[in-house]
Amino acid sequence: MSKHLLLAFGALLLASASTASAQNLTEAQARAIIAPWYSLFNVATRGDVKSIQEQVLPTDYESCAGYLPGECWGRDTSIKVVGNFAKSIPDMKFDIKEVLVADDRVVVRGEVTGTPAGELFGVPHTGKSFRMMAIDIQTIRDGKIAKTYHMENWLSALGQLRAK
C-alpha cells in the first residue's frame, strides 16, 4: 500500500512541478519563444518559412482560425498559408502591441498592415493599404508553440480596401 501511495505522491509532485514551470513563464521568455513565428508575418524581412516553422512548431501543431467552429489545420497547411502571404501581401507586417502570459498561454495583440498585390478575398486590386487588429492565443509546450487560436479583423481590412 505504501508503494502505491509513494507513486501517487510522486505523480502529484511531478504534475505540480510542470504546472509551476508553466506558470513561471515570463513575458521575456514568451516573447523569445514567439518571436520567430511573428517574424514570418513581416514578409519583406522573413527567413525561410518552412525551416522557421519547423523550428518553432511541433509536428502536431494546430492552428485554429475561429471563423468556423472546429476549423483547425496542422503545421504543413500552416506553412503553405503563411508562405502565400508573400505573394498576396508582399509588404505585410505584424507589429506586436501587447503580450500577456497566463500559465502556458501567451496572448498577443498585434496590428497587421499591408498592401495586397492583387485581388484579396474577392476584393479587386485597388492599390490601397489596410491596417487591422489581430488577437492570438498561443499554447506553449516544451518551448514551442503547440496550438494557436487566432482572429484577424479581415472585415475591417477589406472595408479599407473598398473605401472610396
Each language-model region and where it sits:
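Short acidic-aromatic low-complexity motifs
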Residues: 23-60
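Bacterial N-terminal signal peptides that target proteins for export
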Residues: 1-7
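Low-complexity, intrinsically disordered terminal/linker segments enriched in charged
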Residues: 23, 146-164
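Sec/Tat signal peptide C-region and signal peptidase I cleavage site
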Residues: 18-22
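Exposed beta-sheet edge and beta->alpha loop/turn motif
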Residues: 111-141
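A solvent-exposed, acidic/Ser-Thr-rich amphipathic alpha-helical stretch
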Residues: 50-103, 111
